[in-house]
Structures are given as C-alpha cells and as structure tokens.
C-alpha cells in the first residue's frame, strides 16, 4: 500500500478532478495465500471433520484483495482484478492496463505486483 500511495502522489493525479469511473486497478500476483490454504486444509484434515475455518482464511488467500483495497481506499470504480500467471503476472497486468488505456476504456490504471506467501 505504501508503494501505491507513493506512486499516486508522485503521479500528479488530482483525485478530486478525475472521473473515478475511468480509473481502474489491475494487479499481478505470482502466488498468494498458498501457505494459508495449506494450513487450513491440514487443520481441517486433522480435526474432527467439522468444517471450521479461520475467519481470515478467504481475505488472506485471495489474490484480488490488493486491487480491491486500493480501489476502495481511493474510490476508483473502473476495472478491478488480478492477473495470476506465475512470473509473468506483473507483465500481464501492465499489458492489460496499457490496453484499457489504449482502447479508450480508461484514463488511468494503477498497476503493480504482490508476491505474498502467508
């Protein structure tokens, strides 16, 4: 989040004047939450069979949490998703961002990469 905030501040974007419907967030994630998923499955398998999961299981596991949080923080209402394609994730996110702008669907796309093993 710190790098996103710095990027937006350095961009010169006037958040009061832009059309937030035309600002999207496309993020890349090489992998996210796999350790969380593994731990939950092991806990479930070694338990009594009752399907109990940590309430943070989904938020810690899904790769799309980052662009969602960025969009909510800044009120961006354009395209919002994560590309997951191993080492090419950030490149795919940047190409998607370029195409949204090039084709006239958006004026601004915030793009980046997160690689988290939690």
Regions found by a protein language model. Name each.
Residues 9-19, 27-116:
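Acyl-thioester C-C bond-transforming condensing/cleaving domain
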Residues 1-6, 15:
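N-terminal amphipathic, basic-rich helices that act as targeting or association modules
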Residues 1, 24-28:
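Short, conserved beta-strand segments within well-ordered enzyme catalytic domains
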């Amino acid at each position: 989040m710190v790098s996103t905030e710095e990027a937006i501040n350095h961009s010169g974007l006037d958040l009061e004047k832009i059309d937030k419907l035309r600002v999207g967030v496309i993020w890349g994630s090489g992998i996210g939450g796999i350790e969380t998923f593994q731990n939950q499955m092991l806990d479930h398998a070694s338990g009594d069979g009752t399907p109990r999961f940590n309430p943070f299981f989904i938020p810690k596991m899904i790769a799309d949490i980052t662009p969602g949080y960025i969009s909510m923080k800044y009120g961006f209402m354009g395209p919002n998703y994560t590309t997951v394609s191993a080492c090419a994730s950030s490149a795919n996110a940047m190409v998607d961002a370029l195409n949204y702008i090039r084709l006239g669907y958006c004026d601004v796309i915030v793009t980046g990469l997160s690689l988290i093993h939690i």
